[in-house]
């Protein structure tokens, strides 16, 4: 992500919120958080999202209007499980030389992704995978500590609910239903 970019983050869980923060820290001009769960969309602005959408279709209309048809520079897929069909929607959200970054893990049996190869070539769009943000721990961790210490990186705010060990099943239910960004079990 570069300063001035329009960024779409699909999936506003823990990884998505950190992608939103990364885009904010990198200087993105507009950051759209896409998630069907209202609670997560509401939380996203606190991490740096400038806009939210409940679906990819809603995000496309919003981004198209915001950019006067130019579309996003980057779309980051941070959904819990990636499906091959998500790439077509993500590619449709980015404009010329747009980049799609996939952080979500796909199902082992799913071996194909979808999208227009013609559009990908004509508009020089890119798709890439990223594991752990493609980080370099010896370089990145000291920088992240500096950002956290300066109040620019929100980590404590990611924990939206704490559970006792007796509440572990409730914690799993909340995780599955999207009622948390991150839950913490204290024992």
For the regions a language model picked out, list residue spans one by one.
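Glycine-centered, small-residue-biased loops immediately flanking beta-strands
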Residues: 5, 98-99, 125
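C-terminal hydrophobic helical "lid"/dimerization subdomain
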Residues: 57, 88-92, 96, 134-187
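Short amphipathic alpha-helix with an adjacent loop that forms part of the alpha/beta core around
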Residues: 59-69
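N-terminal Rossmann-like NAD(P) cofactor-binding module of classical short-chain dehydrogenase/reductase
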Residues: 76
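Short strand-turn motif at the edge of the Rossmann-like AdoMet-binding core
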Residues: 79-80, 103-107, 131-133, 158
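Rossmann-fold NAD(P)-binding glycine/threonine-rich loop
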Residues: 105-124, 141-144
């Amino acid at each position: 992500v570069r300063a001035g970019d329009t960024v779409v983050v699909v999936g506003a869980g823990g990884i998505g919120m950190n992608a939103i923060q990364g885009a904010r820290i990198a200087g993105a001009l507009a950051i759209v958080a896409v998630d069907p769960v209202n609670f997560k969309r509401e939380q996203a602005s606190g991490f740096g999202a400038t806009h939210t959408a409940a679906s990819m279709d809603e995000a496309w209309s919003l981004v198209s209007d915001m950019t006067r048809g130019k579309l996003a520079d980057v779309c980051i897929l941070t959904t819990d499980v990636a499906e091959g069909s998500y790439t077509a929607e993500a590619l449709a959200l980015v404009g010329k030389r747009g980049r799609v970054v996939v952080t979500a893990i796909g199902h082992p049996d799913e071996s194909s992704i979808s999208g227009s190869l013609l559009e990908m070539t004509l508009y020089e769009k890119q798709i890439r995978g990223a594991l752990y943000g493609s980080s370099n721990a010896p370089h990145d961790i000291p920088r992240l500590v500096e950002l956290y210490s300066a109040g620019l990186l929100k980590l404590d705010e990611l924990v939206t609910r704490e559970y006792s060990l007796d509440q572990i099943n409730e914690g799993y239910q909340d995780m599955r239903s999207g009622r948390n960004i991150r839950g913490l079990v204290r024992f």
